Amino acid sequence: MSTQSQARANPGLEGIVAAETALSLVDGERGELIVAGHELRELAQHDFEDVVDLLWDAAGVRAGARVAATPLPAATLALLDDAARRRVDPMDALRMAAGTLSAASDAAAARLLVGAFPTIVASYARLTRGEQPLAPRADLSFAANFLFMYTGAEPHPELVRGLNGYLTTVADHGLNASTFTARVIMSTGSDFVSAITGAVGALKGPLHGGAPGPALDMVFEIGDAARAETVLRAKLARGERLMGFGHRVYKARAPTCWRRLRHACSRAAATRASTSSRVPSKQRR
């Protein structure tokens, strides 16, 4: 019998070792995430910029100064403005805008892409609301700049802390679908921008980074906690899939990274509620 006839497919590359890396390890059984040799709980107290430096050092990338939110070229802003007028899906707008960027070296491209993404996302959000984009400020951190560019207001320290907690948690997550896509593209000798635009396309999928979308749709459909059981039982009776439950890799009931995210989101939500309650009603939108 030939070797070819003995070969079998492994759906989702399960059980296949496709690469070796020192960047991160996802221990699904224990629910732990190790980033560049450090447990997530160690990194949770640090800024996102610190984690980026750690990952780039582990990868041998010499990107120079610390990463920071960067202004967008006029051509990128024009593309986003046109996309907002046409109500383009935000992930498509992100992919299209990233494709307008270019740099002279891989290290420069890495800094440019990481620095431009918060500006792209915040700018597109403002344009879809009929507001003018804001340039990042040199006196603000990466997380604080995103909040400033998104809202136009001075960011509350607790919200900055919460966003930092989120960003450090998702900075690197093993060989997931979008990372694998980017590595395949880079393996052909292509460039960073092409790899990242391909990765964004993979990230958009509802079985990857796009999963929160259908989950939120379901939350909005339920509307009130009292309706939750009725709505979910009806969906199950129709054979529909319930989004937001289970994970292909994490088997532990409460993975460390999810607990960190929940804690950060809870503190940020409490801060927003407290802040909005102090704003006179005539100033609220």
Question: Can you annotate each of these PLM segments?
Answer:
Residues 1-285:
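Hydrophobic alpha-helical bundle cores within soluble ligand-binding/oligomerization subdomains
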